[in-house]
Amino acid sequence: MSLVFKTPKSENLTSAGILILRIGLAFGFFWAGSGKVSDPAGFGGMLNMMTGMDPMMATNLALVIGVFELLSGTFVLIGLITRPAAIFQIVILIGALSMFGLDFTQGPGIWKDPALIGVAIMLVLNGSGKFGIDYLISKKFNRIKESEKQ
């Protein structure tokens, strides 16, 4: 049989795909979080304008959101507590969609947040895959459980 039709082990292929999606999602959150951390007054001003929130509170909230975006991006990138980090990212992305709406007349950029929500949902359902710290931890716990049974 030709190598063209030979299928590699699907577990490794799936984990490689999950890793690629984790990297993309993580860098999206690094980009967004670093912007908020480096200039919290900028995002805070937008929050103030859109919600009427106190300017100081809006700036502080922008900083907190930015730090958590950086942390969740780091966790998703290394595959540690991937599911909770992805759930947090879904909440942030839904918040962004609720603030800015879905104006499909603005071109293909509007699909970014729904696409990222899809990636985050996939991570919630599948975890980090074989190429994440979660996998190594679960493998270690499974070995401990098996040794306790014996």
Task: Enumerate the language-model features and the residues they cover.
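Hydrophobic alpha-helix position signal
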Residues: 48-50, 75, 123
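Perimembrane loop-to-helix junctions flanking transmembrane segments
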Residues: 44-57
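Extended, low-polarity transmembrane helix blocks
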Residues: 1-38, 56-67, 71, 78-150
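Core FKBP-type peptidyl-prolyl cis-trans isomerase
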Residues: 38-39, 43-44
